[in-house]
Amino acid sequence: MTVGTILVTGAFGQVGKRCTQILLERGRTVIATDLRTGKTVAAQAELSAGAGALIPTYIDLLDAEAVREVVVTHRPEAIIHLAAIVSPPSYRNPGLARRVNVGGTENLLAAAASLPGPPLFLMASSAAVYGSRNPYRYPERITPETAVNPIDQYGEDKVLAEEAIRASGLPHALLRLGGVVSPDTRLDGDYLLLIRATPGDNRIHAVDARDVALAFANGVDREATLAGKVLLIAGNESYVKLQRDLEDDMMAGVGLGRLGPSASLPGDPTDDRGWAFTGWFDTTEAQQLLDFQEHDWHQTVAWIAESQGHLRAVLRALGPILRPVMLTVLKLQRRAEGRGPYADPWTLIAKKYGSGALAAAD
């Protein structure tokens, strides 16, 4: 069945704007919701210049009445729910993140459930639901059946949102995303801390934001095969990486060059809480159902590199000077933070943001 009208939350973000563009190019009507900022308005203007029927709607998902009005007015046949306060920014205000990530989802579900024809509800969940993944204890791939065990508040938010969706009675699919990569990622202090906290030998399964967008766009017409499923969204085998290798590939791509193993601390093989919330996905079923893996890792790196423009040439020239300086700074930061021989990411994150950044203790 071809779905004509789709509501997309977070429609002007790194995945949302690309998903919206695909849907518009396919002749669909897209109710594009987001918060009004300079970036979202610019993305709206770019999308409005193309084909398809774009209906931009700036609302806060915490405003239940506004959400209901949009849903009841436009009666979407499918909802793609991408909006969230993601980690690490969520660590700064976990209370607000919980209200948006869980409460906002509940508002959207309540509005959708009031429609005479229930829409298909596709939600962007996260690898964060699986928590710390010690590859020495759990060498196998993550599958849709792998038990959730969040270690941070963001993963806990996603688990709670998933539970609300299951309880809603709406036809749905939960798309748990790997490490989404695009030129839109802003490497501010929070992201740099998360990168430094992550063990260099931590497993990470990356995915191009364009492929994530395609997965959601393809999903809206496939309710019969998707409903009730958990699907793991990550790239093909070229995206199966260790954290240090991924970072160095990106740094080489933008011109700085590789920092090497000494830029990261390793994970502790004996500590199940000493690893980040990423692992390697078994994407077999998701790829069969959604047919979304169109890019290879080298294409994603090239995309990032091209986005740097003339800065790439400058970084390439300065790389031999900058690399040893960066390694020295990283070493001094670790010493100042009192870090030991292992990365121990969640101790560092709790020290920086407080215990609210972590999932509630059992």
Task: Report residues per predicted region.
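NAD(P)H-binding glycine-rich loop region in Rossmannoid oxidoreductase-like domains
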Residues: 58-100
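Conserved beta-loop-beta element that borders a ligand/cofactor-binding pocket
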Residues: 126, 159-184
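Short alpha-helical oligomerization interface
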Residues: 89-104, 142-150
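N-terminal Rossmann NAD(P)H-binding glycine-rich loop of SDR-like oxidoreductase domains
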Residues: 4-26
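Mid/C-terminal beta-alpha module of Rossmann-like enzyme folds, strongest
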Residues: 215-289, 295-303, 308-319, 326-362
